[in-house]
């Protein structure tokens, strides 16, 4: 029979466990330490990425804090023209790669972006999200983090990379454009799980109404190897998605099913902010 003291202790411990899990700030996943890199590992987290991937210590890294008071407004910067973003992706795979949920189209449609004569072809879409509604995005805008940041990754003929970033904020209303993704997340709970999308995905439905309004700077990949020379276009418009849709993402795990995965929720998968150094953030308003 438990004594009053032991009962009080158990209740206190339960409250503490609930507090830390609810806040999402503490992720205790031993399997993370077995990976080449992770977001929450004790020895291979973001602060240590540069030990293995030297470019992660570079001077032009991403993500950054975008401060609108310090951007340079350039009326001559070209519009971001998108082609075939309105054409449904009828065939695509989605994979839990242990770091994100990533979607790769498998149809023959070339979806492209063009800015100032440079054309980049869409390759994949992935996401960074948080354990709470006020964190998750990699970039910040005037100090604010959003619940999720979508990255539309493109390459050109020279294999240069351009990424379009879109902020999503938590809402009571679900995003219809996100539903083809959410409906299959339960099929990829663990790392290396993959499946095909069951419904058509329209990229345009994941974009704000005026994608030509954006912030642009030169940066890097936000994951190892942190390769620099990436052209970033962070769209100004903020999209909405349902809290329940975010909850489905938070139910993914960062490790495989054969590991001790209980503490390995795939969440808060965003890299800390990197110094801007001498770079300039260009702001457009078209």
Where are the language model's segments positioned?
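Alpha-carbonic anhydrase
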Residues: 2-286
């Amino acid at each position: 029979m438990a004594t009053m003291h032991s009962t009080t202790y158990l209740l206190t411990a339960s409250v503490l466990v609930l507090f830390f899990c609810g806040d999402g700030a503490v992720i205790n996943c031993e399997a993370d330490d077995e990976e080449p890199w992770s977001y929450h590992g004790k020895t291979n987290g973001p602060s240590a990425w540069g030990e293995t991937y030297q470019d992660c210590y570079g001077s032009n890294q991403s993500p950054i804090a975008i401060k609108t008071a310090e951007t340079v407004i350039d009326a001559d910067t070209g519009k971001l023209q998108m082609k075939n973003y309105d054409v449904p992706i009828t065939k695509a795979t989605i994979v839990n790669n242990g770091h994100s949920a990533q979607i790769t189209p498998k149809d023959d449609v070339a979806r492209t972006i063009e800015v100032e004569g440079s054309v980049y072809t869409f390759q994949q879409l992935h996401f960074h999200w948080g354990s709470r509604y006020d964190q998750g995005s990699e970039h910040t805008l005037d100090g604010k983090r959003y619940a999720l940041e979508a990255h539309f990754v493109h390459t050109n003929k020279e294999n240069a990379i351009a990424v379009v970033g879109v902020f999503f904020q938590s809402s009571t209303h679900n995003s219809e454009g996100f539903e083809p993704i959410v409906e299959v997340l339960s099929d990829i709970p663990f790392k290396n799980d993959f499946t095909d999308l069951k419904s058509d995905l329209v990229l345009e439905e994941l974009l704000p109404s005026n994608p030509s309004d954006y912030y642009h700077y030169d940066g890097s990949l936000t994951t190892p190897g942190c390769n620099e020379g990436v052209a970033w276009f962070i769209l100004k418009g903020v999209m909405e998605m349902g809290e329940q849709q975010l909850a489905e993402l938070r139910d993914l795990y960062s490790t495989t099913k054969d590991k001790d995965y209980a503490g390995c929720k795939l969440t808060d998968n965003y890299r800390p902010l990197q110094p801007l150094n001498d770079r300039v953030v260009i702001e457009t308003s078209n």
